Amino acid sequence: MSGAKPFVLCLTGSLGMGKSTAAKFFAEAGVPVHDSDAVVHTLYEGEAVAAIAAAFPGTTSGGKVDRSKLATKVIDDQAALARLEAIVHPLVAKARDKFLADAQARSAPVVVLDIPLLFEIGGEGSCDAVVVVSAPADMQRTRAFERPGMTEEKFATLLAKQVPDEEKRRRADFIVDSSRGYDYARAQVRDILRAIANMPRKR
């Protein structure tokens, strides 16, 4: 391993806030981005399949996890969710550690960890700074219901499991307002990258 450790910028935001779009803007600016959700998708097609099949019979087919079947097993069952997290979280952490080591080896000055449930899992300690992507509640709702399969019940359940946006904003080092269009959000990302050049590290 060579090079200094990169500045770790953690990106988070509630359902429908535009976090994925903000992540793309960081990537456009040349920043390596680690997408936790994408890692989980990969695990559900490979490394995690056997363990999930054993813990949740009937949730896999064709060598892959059926996400909708798995969701029905865990959405209202905290014990089942804890079992799933015990399988998935260590594998996600391993992938994240490899990403950080690779970034350090390439002497990347800054990286982004895209972690949807950053505050919910108490992950702030792995960050030098936290970026929260936010938008008004009515816009959040509209975006969320553009997703396939979204229902009132599912929306309410997902929101109930997330730290409220107001609290996320309060705990953020930076906020990206995604309500004013792509160009405005992209400019905010550039401003953040300039600002962190002079920020002390927290880790």
Write out the residue ranges for each language-model feature.
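Glycine-rich phosphate-binding loop of ATP-dependent small-molecule kinases
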Residues: 1-66, 194-203
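Hydrophobic "anchor" residues on beta-strands that sit immediately upstream
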Residues: 8, 31-33, 109-110, 124, ...
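Well-ordered beta-strand positions
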Residues: 32, 38, 129, 173-174
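ATP-dependent small-molecule kinase phosphotransfer cores
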Residues: 38, 42-109
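An amphipathic alpha-helix signature
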Residues: 49-53, 137-142, 152, 156
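ATP-dependent NMP and nucleoside kinases share a basic, alpha-helical "lid"
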Residues: 97-106, 110-147
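Small-molecule kinase domains that catalyze NTP-dependent phosphoryl transfer to phosphate-bearing small molecules
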Residues: 125-126, 146, 150-203
